[in-house]
Each structure stands twice: as C-alpha cells, then as structure tokens.
C-alpha cells in the first residue's frame, strides 16, 4: 500500500467545520473596512527575493532565517511572501497608484515563514493587512487604530486586547539612539545571551524586545528611546495620543516596542492579549514613510498594519463562545418517492431564484424521512421543505419549522413567501 502524503509541518488544512467561523470573522472584518472606504488589492504570493531584502532588512530574522527562497527554472531567486507590505508597495509603484495620490488599501491571504510551529505560529499563516499611502499626519494613524478597535467590538473581544504604542522617531534620530544603545550594551556584553550578542551590532533595537528576563532587567538602565526623538516625531506622537484619548481608546506607551522590520519609523503599535499564552500579539503596525522611495518610487508617506488571522480566530473562540459560525444551510429540501427528485430539484432552483442569499441544500442519495431529517439537523437547517409523491401530484409542499416542529402544507407557488416569514 502506498504511503499517505501528509501536509507539510506547520502548514495546516482548515476543514469545513473550521472554515465556517473563519468566514464569519473575515466577513465582519471586511464589512468594517468597507465602512471606512478601504479598497481591496490582490497580490502575488511569490515575489522577487531582492524586494524583501531591501524592504525588510538584510539583517532581520525574517530575511536571515525565515524566508522560503528558491531558484526558478530561469535562475531567478524568488521568495514566498513572509509579509504583505513590501508586495503592496511594489504593486503601488509598478501601477502608478502612489505618487501625489491617497490610497487606502487592504489585502488578505497566506504568508510563509520557516519558524518552529506552535499554537498561533505557523509556517503558512494568514494575514489581513491595511496600508495607507499619501497621508502623513497623526490623524490617519489614529484612524487605523480606531478601525481595529471597531473590529474588536464587533467580534466581542474588546476586553481581552490592549493597545501598546511607541514612537521610534526619524531615521536620523534612530541612528543616534542606536549608537547610544550599542555603547550601553557593550558594557554588559558578557551578560547578554548569544542571540542578543549577535543582534547588538546587526540590529540592536531588536535587543529591546528580547524575551530573556535577565536581558530585560539589564535594559532597565539602558538609554530611553524617547530621549532621542526628533521634535517632529514628538509632535506627531503627541498628536496621535491626543486623538486616541478623544476617541476613548486606552493605550500604554511601551518604550521598548520597536517592531521587527527595518522599514518602520515614528509610530509603531501593537494590540496584545494575555489570552493566548506566549503568542500575545494579535495585530501590529506603524509608519514606514521611507519605504516607497527605498523601493524605487517617489517619496510617499505611508502607514499600515497586519493582523494574524489564526491568532484572531483562536482569541475569538477562547473569549467569545457566543460568536458562532453561520449555519451551513438554512433550508433542507427532503424528497421521498421514486418520481419526486426532479420535482424537488426544480423547486429548489425556483426557491434559490426567489430567495437570494438563502442557503438551501437538496437531499441526494435517497434515504427515508428519518435519515433525511437527520441530515437536515447535521447541516444546521432551520426549515425543511418536504416533497412526497402526493405533494408533487397536488402542487404543494410541506414546510416544517425544525425548531418548533410545526409544519404547514403550502402551495408550491407560495413556498418562498412562507419561508421568508419563517426565516425572518
């Protein structure tokens, strides 16, 4: 017997029972995006490798350790996208969407990183990202955060996420802080773990979010990033905080929040939770005003965020059990008798025409009434429409409310109207 081929470790199948809750959550997210006037953009999952090296940074963990990179048959180096911002910027430049224009875009889809799989962290994972181009004030930063807060309310998880904010300043201010931080860390080099020693010279700001408690204790005496901010960044951050306070959105300033990708400047933020163990970041982003120019476009202010959908689904299921998946089926059409199947299928098509948006499943494969009603229950149907030989002969159908058990014989021409009343 041939050996079964299984999914790649860290790349998961999502089965029908799971995709239903994903669809409801994604529908909620998309409705909110539409209410803010954001437009969808669809992007390739494979890009040229230099795009990510230039955008994310050569010495980041993502580029050094985590990217799925391969050579195609033409000898070109290609990479499965590890994040969405770089590809979105590339598309904006390529198609002339950015220069002297405002764009509010969102995308959704799989990303790929070669990490150690664990709950909430996978090698293929899904993100929803938002990117705004052409606006440089703190008001658009605030709008993005307000948009995410509206998501949490719609999903019933507001009490389980908290907002952390920081400003990492301009590129020049960050370079000055980098020098001061390296000078500090060099004094305690023997107390750093190997990962922090490596990062100290390649990407020292990443030492700030080390998970090592001994390193975190050491950093209590480190120079504060806030002391090195340029005046424009201070004013921008103060304006953002004021807007969030006016909107009633609570936040904490976390001066060790830096984000793991090199393209960020000024505002950075994360929504975090204590309900998912070590994988506490649900949504994160910030400003990247230099990235468009860095990738070959004209200087364009930009801000955005990405949200991990696997973690969001886990969080919703953990803290809001009332948020249920929509039923697969609203109406189940039961047909019994040798000559009823074609009539049942014809009635089903007519009902789909008259009741757009209603989910109707027709029984196939035979079975007595008991078996067919069991199938209706399995699929979560609220109503059954029953056709037997006598109903076909009389031009009627029996409509049964599967919750109350009440049933009514109805002329086939009136079934749609009766169902509208039952389904509300």
UniProtKB/Swiss-Prot annotation:
It comes from the Bacteria. PROSITE patterns: AA_TRNA_LIGASE_II. It catalyses: tRNA(His) + L-histidine + ATP = L-histidyl-tRNA(His) + AMP + diphosphate + H(+). The keyword Zinc does not apply. Belongs to the class-II aminoacyl-tRNA synthetase family. Homodimer. This is Histidine--tRNA ligase. It comes from Escherichia coli (strain SE11). The gene is hisS.
């Amino acid at each position: 017997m041939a050996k079964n081929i299984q999914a790649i470790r860290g790349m998961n199948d999502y089965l029908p029972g799971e995709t239903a809750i994903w669809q409801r959550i994604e529908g909620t997210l998309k409705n909110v995006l539409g209410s803010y006037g954001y437009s969808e953009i669809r992007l390739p999952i494979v890009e040229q490798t230099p795009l990510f090296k230039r955008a994310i940074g050569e010495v980041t963990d993502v580029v050094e350790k985590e990217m799925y990179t391969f050579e195609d048959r033409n000898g070109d180096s290609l990479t499965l996208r590890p994040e969405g911002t770089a590809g979105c910027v590339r598309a904006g430049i390529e198609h002339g969407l950015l220069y002297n224009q405002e764009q509010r875009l969102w995308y959704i889809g799989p990303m790929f990183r070669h990490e150690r799989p664990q709950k909430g962290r996978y090698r293929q994972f899904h993100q929803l990202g938002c990117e705004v181009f052409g606006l440089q004030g703190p008001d658009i930063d605030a709008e993005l955060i307000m948009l995410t807060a509206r998501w949490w309310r719609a999903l019933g998880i507001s009490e389980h996420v908290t907002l952390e904010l920081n400003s990492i300043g301009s590129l020049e201010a960050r370079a000055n802080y980098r020098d001061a931080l390296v000078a500090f860390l060099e004094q305690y080099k023997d107390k750093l773990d190997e990962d922090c020693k490596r990062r100290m010279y390649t990407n020292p700001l990443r030492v700030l979010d080390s998970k090592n408690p001994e390193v975190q204790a050491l950093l209590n005496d480190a120079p504060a990033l806030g002391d090195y901010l340029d005046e424009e960044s201070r004013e921008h951050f103060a304006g953002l905080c004021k807007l969030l306070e006016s909107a009633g959105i609570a936040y904490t300033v976390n001066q060790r929040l830096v984000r793991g990708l090199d393209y960020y400047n000024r505002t950075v933020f994360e929504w975090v939770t204590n309900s998912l163990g070590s994988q506490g970041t649900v949504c994160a982003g910030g400003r990247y005003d230099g990235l468009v120019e860095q990738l070959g476009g004209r200087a364009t202010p930009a801000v955005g965020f990405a949200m991990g959908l696997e973690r969001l689904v886990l969080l919703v299921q953990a803290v809001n059990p009332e948020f249920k998946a929509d039923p697969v089926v609203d109406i189940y059409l039961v047909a019994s008798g040798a000559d009823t199947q074609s009539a049942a299928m014809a009635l089903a098509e007519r009902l789909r025409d008259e009741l757009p948006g209603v989910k109707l499943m027709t029984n196939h494969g035979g079975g007595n009434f008991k078996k067919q009603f069991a199938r209706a229950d399995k699929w979560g149907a609220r109503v059954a429409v029953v056709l037997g030989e006598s109903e076909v002969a009389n031009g009627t159908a029996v409509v049964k409310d599967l919750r109350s058990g009440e049933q009514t014989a109805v002329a086939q021409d009136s079934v749609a109207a009766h169902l509208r009343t039952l389904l509300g």
